[in-house]
């Protein structure tokens, strides 16, 4: 008997194993079958299209001349579309692959955990008290919170059910617990494969036991996918089947997200045992906050389970949630009683409603139910009582176009001024001085408003500016103690002193930049509109040096700092701004040379003054102050002094730039001197009126004598000056070469920095877009960038 029973069990297990093998084979071949079906479906669809088109063409030929040709064609097209839809649906059904049970349950548990987290966040949002207990008075939707708790409970039960299904799936083909010893060992005669139920083991197809709770064994090739011998975990490391692995992963995620502490080898009955033991409909007892009263009086209006229960009016007849239903029943009963319809309720509420109807009929003064009765309110009368009838006249309405921040300030000032004037007139009319001051303040405010609401410009006194310039000449960045001391001495605000130093530094830097951009041969010029303190200070210091050099050549009535320049285009006498001449102090050799070359000063007629002024534009830009001179001989003398200063600067620049070509330059100067002498002789005749004045005649005689002296001593001075100039020129050239090398190195360093920044930006796609939109000088050059490599060699 026992042998027959064991044979029957073995036959049943073999049948189950065959069924499972067929399923596994179907899943393995499903992918290949799917691809083959897709290819065949594509071919069949093309063939079907061709057949349908041929049929349509043949039928259209036969029915071309019939009346119902169009209708037949439409009917045929609809039939073809329907057949295509049916075929596509069949193909979709056939192509559907059965999802593995372990993957399906794993997705299900992931969805349930996300849902639990969302509902728990809703509960936590209303559970906290907030900062200083402000959330205590928050309106709490109790129905929504109760629904969230029910959803969490349902999710927990769903997780329990998923683990139960995994245990059932893993129990198929498992070994009995009797066979397993207390230490977990199993005899080899009792081990069989859960898929094929065979006990045989081969070297390349060995039987492997699952270390989970399923108590199953598998051949290596019976698994899906088959397990290779190399991938078998060595030593004490465990191997798990797909169902046990899925169960372990689900329990681990539950413990991590929800905060539970279930062991990995726990049974499905141990998971959420308390929630499963609760009776149906008592989910609210799990909630710790169910006894809290609702802060909202109308919180019971919304019941999220109304749709599920089909309205739920019958369940809310008695209790707090049936307030609205009671009111509706009362209103309907009142309407029915007024129309003469009898109410047959038979309950206690029906008697109460009938009593209320009788009370309404007997006394009209008392309102028992229904909407609140409010008497009509005359809002115009209420407004007059609160603000008075004259409130509209006192208010001055303004249009939207007149509104603005300046207008608001203006109205405020006008109202303040008007109120102060009224109070002063009412109190006493004797204080006329106070009224005048108020009027003056109003005028000032109006003038400020007309100018755009700007503040009055503050100017420092002259003595303070001079003192600050002296300190700035010593140090451009004085310390805080020095600035505070200056502010105390000059009785100024320390902030204004700091601002003055900041502005002067800015102006000095700007002037240095403009001078560095210009050519070295050109004169250092500053526009007449720049009235910075640094520029004025430099010009004042340089005019003192020029005055010392020009004392011997200029007549006694001439002033180098104050001179008048008349434009040749305008005949009208106009006043120009005073301009200070700024030149570098010449050397002793150039001074002697210029004193002997006095013949370079030439009397120029009024018709050629425009040419002289065009040559001297660079000099006139540096001048900042000028006055109108009444006498014409002073005008000519000022022009001559400017010319000498310009020539001094030109000679000095040429001496610095070209020291080796000094002899050729001196010969050119000699020829220029001779030409100027001839011009001076030619120009003496048209200037009879001007030569009558003593100052000009003496100047011409001195120039003629100076020209004769220069011709004789020119050769001697040239030799002496050439030697000295060569020495100075060598020093200057060495310094210039060093400066040029430093400048070149600085430029290369800047280019290297720019290239590295661009390369760093080019690594990211955002940086490429920015480089495409940016405008820089490197974009105009070639796209190839040459990066120099610096190599440092040690001196041997």
UniProtKB/Swiss-Prot annotation:
Cross-referenced Gene3D superfamilies, in alphabetical order?
Homeodomain-like, Zinc/RING finger domain, C3HC4 (zinc finger)
Q: Ranges of Polar residues compositional bias?
A: 538-547, 560-569, 581-600
Region (Disordered) location: 34-57, 80-99, 282-347, 393-422, 511-736
Which residue stretches belong to region Leucine-zipper?
A: 738-759
| Zinc finger motifs (PHD-type), residue ranges | 190-247
Q: Where is the composition biased (Low complexity)?
A: 570-580
Renumbered to this chain, the Basic residues biased-composition regions fall at 81-90
Major localization listed first in the record, in broad terms: nucleus
Keyword Transcription listed: yes
Q: Name one GO cellular component term.
A: nucleus
What InterPro entries does the record tag this protein with? HD, Homeodomain-like_sf, PRHA-like_PHD-finger, Zinc_finger_PHD-type_CS, Znf_FYVE_PHD, Znf_PHD, Znf_PHD-finger, Znf_RING/FYVE/PHD
Pfam family for this entry, one = PHD
Q: What's any GO biological process attached to this entry? A: defense response
Where are the compositionally biased (Basic and acidic residues) regions? 624-636, 645-690, 700-733
Q: Which residues form a coiled coil?
A: none
Q: Which family does it belong to?
A: Belongs to the PHD-associated homeobox family.
Known function: Specifically binds to the fungal elicitor-responsive DNA element, 5'-CTAATTGTTTA-3', of the gene PR2 promoter.
Q: What is this protein called?
A: Pathogenesis-related homeodomain protein
Species of the source? Arabidopsis thaliana (Mouse-ear cress)
List the gene name.
PRH
């Amino acid at each position: 008997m026992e042998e027959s029973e064991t044979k029957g069990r073995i036959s049943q297990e073999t049948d189950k194993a065959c069924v499972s093998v067929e399923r596994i084979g179907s899943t393995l071949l499903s992918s290949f079958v799917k691809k083959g079906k897709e290819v065949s479906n594509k071919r069949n669809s093309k063939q079907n299209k061709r057949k349908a088109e041929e049929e349509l063409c043949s039928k259209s030929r036969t029915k071309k001349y019939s009346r119902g040709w169009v209708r037949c064609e439409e009917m045929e097209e609809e039939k073809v579309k329907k057949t295509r839809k049916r075929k596509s649906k069949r193909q979709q059904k056939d192509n559907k692959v059965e999802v593995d049970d372990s993957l399906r349950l794993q997705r299900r548990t992931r969805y349930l955990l996300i849902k639990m987290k969302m509902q728990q966040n809703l509960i936590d949002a209303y559970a906290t008290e907030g900062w200083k207990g402000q959330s205590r008075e928050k309106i709490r939707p109790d129905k929504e919170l109760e629904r969230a708790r029910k959803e969490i409970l349902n999710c927990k039960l769903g997780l329990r059910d998923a683990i139960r299904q995994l245990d059932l799936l893993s129990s198929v083909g498992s070994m009995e617990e009797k066979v397993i010893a207390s230490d977990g060992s199993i005899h080899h005669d009792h081990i069989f494969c859960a898929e094929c139920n065979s006990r045989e083991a081969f070297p390349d197809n060995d039987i492997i036991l699952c270390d989970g709770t399923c108590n199953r064994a598998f051949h290596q090739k019976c698994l899906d996918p088959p397990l290779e011998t190399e991938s078998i975990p060595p030593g004490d490391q465990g191997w798990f089947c797909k169902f046990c692995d899925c169960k372990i992963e689900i329990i681990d995620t539950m413990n991590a997200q929800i905060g539970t502490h279930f062991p990995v080898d726990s049974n499905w009955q141990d998971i959420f045992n308390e929630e499963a033991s609760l009776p149906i409909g008592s989910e609210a007892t799990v909630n710790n906050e169910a006894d809290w009263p609702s802060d909202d009086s109308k919180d019971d209006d919304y019941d999220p389970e109304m749709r599920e229960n089909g309205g739920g009016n019958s369940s809310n007849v008695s209790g707090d949630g049936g307030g609205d239903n009671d009111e509706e029943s009362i209103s309907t009963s009142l309407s029915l009683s007024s129309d003469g319809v009898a109410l047959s309720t038979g309950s206690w509420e029906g008697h109460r409603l009938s009593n209320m109807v009788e009370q309404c009929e007997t006394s009209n003064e008392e309102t028992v139910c229904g909407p609140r009765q409010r008497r009509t309110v005359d809002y115009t009368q209420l407004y007059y009582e609160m603000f008075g009838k004259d409130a509209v006249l006192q208010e001055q309405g303004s249009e939207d176009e007149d509104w603005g921040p300046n207008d608001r300030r203006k109205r405020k000032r006008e109202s303040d001024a008007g109120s102060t004037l009224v109070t002063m007139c009412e109190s006493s009319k004797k204080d006329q001085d106070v009224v005048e001051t108020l009027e003056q303040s109003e005028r000032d405010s109006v003038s400020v408003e007309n100018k755009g609401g700007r503040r009055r410009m503050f100017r420092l006194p002259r003595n303070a500016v001079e003192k600050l310039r002296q300190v700035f000449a010593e140090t451009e960045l004085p310390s805080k103690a020095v600035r505070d001391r200056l502010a105390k001495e000059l009785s100024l605000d320390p902030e204004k002193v700091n601002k003055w130093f900041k502005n002067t530094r800015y102006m000095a830097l700007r002037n240095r930049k403009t001078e560095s951009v210009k050519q070295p041969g050109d004169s250092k010029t500053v526009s007449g509109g720049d009235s910075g303190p640094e520029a004025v200070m430099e010009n004042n210091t340089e005019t003192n040096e020029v005055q010392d050099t020009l004392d011997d050549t200029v007549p006694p009535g001439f002033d180098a700092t104050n001179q008048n320049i008349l434009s040749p285009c305008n005949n009208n006498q106009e006043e120009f701004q005073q301009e200070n001449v700024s030149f570098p102090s010449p050397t002793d050799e150039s001074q002697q040379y210029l004193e002997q070359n006095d013949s370079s000063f030439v009397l120029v007629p009024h018709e050629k003054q425009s040419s002289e002024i065009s040559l001297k534009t660079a000099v006139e830009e540096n001048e900042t102050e000028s006055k109108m001179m009444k006498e014409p001989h002073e005008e000519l003398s000022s022009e001559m002094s400017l010319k000498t200063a310009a020539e001094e600067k030109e000679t000095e620049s040429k001496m610095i730039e070209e020291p080796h070509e000094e002899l050729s330059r001196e010969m050119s100067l000699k020829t220029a001197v001779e030409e100027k002498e001839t011009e001076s002789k030619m120009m003496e005749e048209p200037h009879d009126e001007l030569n009558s004045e003593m100052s000009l005649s003496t100047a011409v005689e001195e120039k003629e004598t100076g020209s004769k002296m220069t011709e004789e001593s020119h050769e001697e001075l040239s030799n002496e000056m050439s030697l000295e100039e060569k020495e100075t020129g060598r020093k200057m050239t060495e310094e210039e070469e060093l400066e040029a090398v430093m400048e070149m190195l600085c430029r290369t360093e800047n280019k290297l920095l720019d290239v590295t920044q661009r390369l760093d930006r080019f690594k990211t796609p955002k940086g490429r877009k920015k480089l495409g939109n940016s405008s820089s000088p490197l974009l105009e050059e070639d796209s190839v960038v040459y990066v120099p490599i610096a190599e440092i060699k040690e001196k041997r």
